């Protein structure tokens, strides 16, 4: 039951005369880390900045929060306008608020991360018109959830210069998805609806940055009931096609 809040005359008078310029008002931005997995690595969608500051550097898709929208709505708007995506798995990641993270003014960034099948991001990054977008491979030099530097590499393996503190945001996103692998179906959005346990294991290995024992992985996934068999087998995969599975629960938030 919701209790209706009443506004007193004193509060109305206070609000009517309130000076919104009394305290500094930092800008708020929303940046989205769009991640996928392919070829044994984590990849992220980046865009080249056309304007100052950091012109020519690569940045996460983002934008400033509008005065009349929620943070989740802003993240959804960024996905639609910068990447043409709707209804993908998206979760709030972290708030980055170092005073000098943006040379223009005080800008607080609320970061989100989104998980997308590789084909989707490849299609966006290789669109026939020049979108200024690039699918970058993430070079993660640390193990587990310790955190540390993350470099973004182009297709030739060259390190891409990143704008603002976006390398730190990428690092936090990798740390988050590594930490969630044990209790959430992170791979759901990174795989087709039906997949083999090998497909799922390769996704986990790419995220963790290390190999996994095949039998132990299979046993752990099946024992926890994270996936259920579809009753079908993969087509065109030799004499003994693998059994296909689907996730039993989609614990994701769409924006």
What are the residue ranges of the model-derived segments?
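N-terminal leader/linker segments that precede catalytic domains of diphosphate-processing enzymes
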Residues: 1-255
């Amino acid at each position: 039951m919701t209790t209706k809040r009443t506004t007193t005359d004193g509060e109305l008078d206070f609000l009517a005369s309130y000076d919104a310029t009394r305290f500094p008002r930092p800008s708020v931005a929303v940046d989205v880390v769009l991640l996928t997995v392919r070829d044994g690595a984590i990849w992220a969608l980046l865009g080249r900045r056309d304007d100052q500051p950091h012109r020519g550097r690569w940045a996460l898709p983002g934008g400033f929060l509008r005065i009349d929208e929620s943070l989740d709505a802003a993240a959804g708007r960024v996905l639609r306008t910068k990447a043409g995506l709707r209804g993908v798995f998206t979760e709030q990641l972290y708030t980055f608020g170092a005073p000098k993270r943006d040379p223009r003014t005080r800008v607080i960034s609320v970061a989100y991360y989104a998980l997308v099948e590789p084909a989707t991001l490849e299609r966006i990054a290789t669109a026939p018109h020049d979108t200024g977008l690039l699918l970058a491979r993430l070079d993660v030099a640390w193990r587990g959830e310790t955190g540390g530097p993350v470099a973004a590499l182009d297709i030739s393996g060259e390190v891409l210069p990143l704008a603002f503190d976006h390398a730190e945001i990428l690092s936090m996103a990798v740390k988050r998805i590594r930490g969630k692998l044990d209790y959430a179906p992170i791979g759901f959005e990174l795989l087709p609806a039906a997949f083999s346990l090998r497909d799922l294991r390769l996704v986990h290995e790419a995220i963790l940055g290390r190999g996994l024992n095949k039998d132990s992985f299979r046993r752990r996934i099946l024992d926890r009931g994270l996936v259920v068999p579809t009753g079908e087998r993969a087509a065109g995969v030799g004499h003994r096609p693998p059994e296909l599975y689907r996730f039993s629960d989609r614990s994701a938030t769409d924006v």
